[in-house]
Amino acid sequence: MSYTWLITRASSGRGAAIALAALEAGHKVIAGARNPAKASQVRPEIQNQGGTWLRLDDSTADVRHVIAKAAKEHGLNVLVNNAGGYALRGVLEDFSETELYQQMETNFFGPIRAIQGALPWSRAQKPGTIFNISSTSDITGFTGFSLYAASKAALEGASEALYGELALFGIRVLVVQPGASRTKFQSAGPRPAVSEACVGTTVDAILQRAVGMAAERR
């Protein structure tokens, strides 16, 4: 049976891979990207295989209406919240108020908005599935990634509660916790600045190694 998938942040990395896998399995795919024109140039195979690009910015409240409109036009069975390609690295005490909100915006508020936009249509077109892409950092809490781990923990907590809310409607909520993979994740966030008090400590070594790994993958 063919379902309609909507995948957020599908222009590169894991999101693009999921979109292509769904297309190859015979499903319909709506690939979300902040700049569809650029995305279609970077990943033309998604459109060539029948995928539809959608301008989708989950950092704005309007994303709810954008998803609702797309669902009305194409249908919607599966939502993939491909959040997490951005991680602020550094010592917790050094993060600014803006950075605190920025990390939560990317990995928590954005996916929640997408879910809110999709739910009315998912309920109407059973069965439905919501995939929230999380991380093993929620389990291990890697040194130097405190904000990232917190944002993923928030998404997983909401997912567990939502599982109970939606079970009666035939909608599954699944959390995916991928480990290390060959994407540009390590280079997506800004280079960490380590406070003087932490220079030479374990957290300093881990952060600098993360930067080195990112450089090796480019």
Curated annotation (Swiss-Prot):
The keyword Transmembrane helix does not apply. GO terms for molecular function: oxidoreductase activity. Pathway: Pigment biosynthesis. Induction: Expression is positively regulated by the transcriptional regulator wor1. Expression is down-regulated during biotrophic growth within tomato leaves. The expression is induced at later stages of infection when conidiophores emerge from the plant and produce conidia. Gene3D superfamilies: NAD(P)-binding Rossmann-like Domain (3.40.50.720). InterPro entries: NAD(P)-bd_dom_sf, SDR_fam, SDR_oxidoreductase. The active site is at 134 (proton donor), 148 (proton acceptor), 152 (lowers pka of active site tyr). The keyword Nucleotidyltransferase does not apply. This is Oxidoreductase claN. It comes from Passalora fulva. The lineage of its organism: Eukaryota, Fungi, Dikarya, Ascomycota, Pezizomycotina.
